[in-house]
Amino acid sequence: MTYHPKSDFLRVMQERGYLADCTDMQALDEALSNGVVPAYIGYDATAASLHVGHLLNIMMLRWLQKTGHKPITLMGGGTTKVGDPSFRSEERPLLTPDRIDENIEGMRKVFARYLSYGEGATDALMLNNAEWLDQLNYLDFLRDIGRHFSVNRMLSFESVKSRLDREQSLSFLEFNYMILQAYDFLELFRRTGCRLQMGGSDQWGNIVNGIDLTRRVLEGEIFGLTSPLLTTSDGRKMGKSAGGAVWLNGEMLAPYDFWQFWRNTTDADVGRFLKLYTELPVEECDRLGALQGSEINAAKILLANEVTTLLHGRDAAEAAEATARAVFEEGGVGGALEVVELPAATLGDGLSVAHFLVAAGLVASGKEAKRLVAENGLRFNNEPVGDANAPVTAATVGEELKVSIGRKKHKLVRLS
């Protein structure tokens, strides 16, 4: 029997498809209905930007704030030094403290687009777990915190078990990650009254550890809520495209390319993505998702515009749509295409088409370039390129050269 929550937040989570599991739905619903509930999601600083795979949880924090509660973004300045082993086949490379700080700053820019930070009761709060983890005394930590954890139970978590079943090494460093993340929840409850941790369903074991620890040490009534691990209808992991990670920082992925990622959504995913990644009413999302044939393209454009507006602003979304129209309908260049700077010295007296594409970073290898040409998938300034060995010179590039790879990838190459 489906539980029907009375709190606005849980109702939104349920209606829009954010909810995978909850440790105690009715008790959490009661807490959310009777006052402001601080809730957090943790983010390790493993890259200079968040990517589309993080966006679902960011939207959960945004809805939390919109429904009258306090979102906490916890930066993993401490835990990033250890690395989360959850469902990974190998240990993460360790980052320097300076690199971690740089990554946190890049992530901060993204959160500021979705959440309102400040000192008010429902204003978002950003914390860094290095504040308390860097100060821990190891022996005290083992005595006061470590004694509450069962190694047998930790080994039973699917995130660890799957790694051990494949006979892949799990370092003691990584094993400690679960204890440190659990300690984060305890520390946040102590410092801010945080009562809810959210995350992807792969974090269930870590979340439950934190709840158990906090109940044992501080007897706090706290909760966990997870979202589904999202894949596209054709089985691809959310956050990746053929060209790599879909970054949320505009410096790492142009707003046009971000817009195009959403415009390329498969028909079967449109309704679901509208509910998860926009704030359009659920009924409208369902109506748009049910469109068929050419009509669904209008829904995809709306999806791309709404998601891009939230991240980059309305002007960027409108510019991206105008560029797409120029590229696909009018054969033009469009002012918002990403520019690739190629040193003139690299081009020299000329390169073959295949070597030019590799040098500009547009394909990974000469073999890929030749396949692209053989399949009639390459155009220069809207003209088909039929010979992978044809010369490309400074005269070919001119002031700028529009390179089209397939129907949906377009770049401007300029000599520097």
Swiss-Prot record:
Annotated binding of ATP, by residue: K240
GO cellular component: cytosol
Keyword ATP-binding included in the entry's annotation: yes
Domain S4 RNA-binding: 351-416
Protein residues bound to L-tyrosine: Y40, Y177, Q181
UniProt superkingdom: Bacteria
Reactions listed under catalytic activity: tRNA(Tyr) + L-tyrosine + ATP = L-tyrosyl-tRNA(Tyr) + AMP + diphosphate + H(+)
Sequence motif: 'KMSKS' region, positions: 237-241
UniProt xrefs under NCBIfam families: tyrS
Similarity field: Belongs to the class-I aminoacyl-tRNA synthetase family. TyrS type 1 subfamily.
Entry-linked HAMAP family: Tyr_tRNA_synth_type1
Name recorded for this polypeptide: Tyrosine--tRNA ligase
Organism listed in the record: Cereibacter sphaeroides (strain ATCC 17029 / ATH 2.4.9)
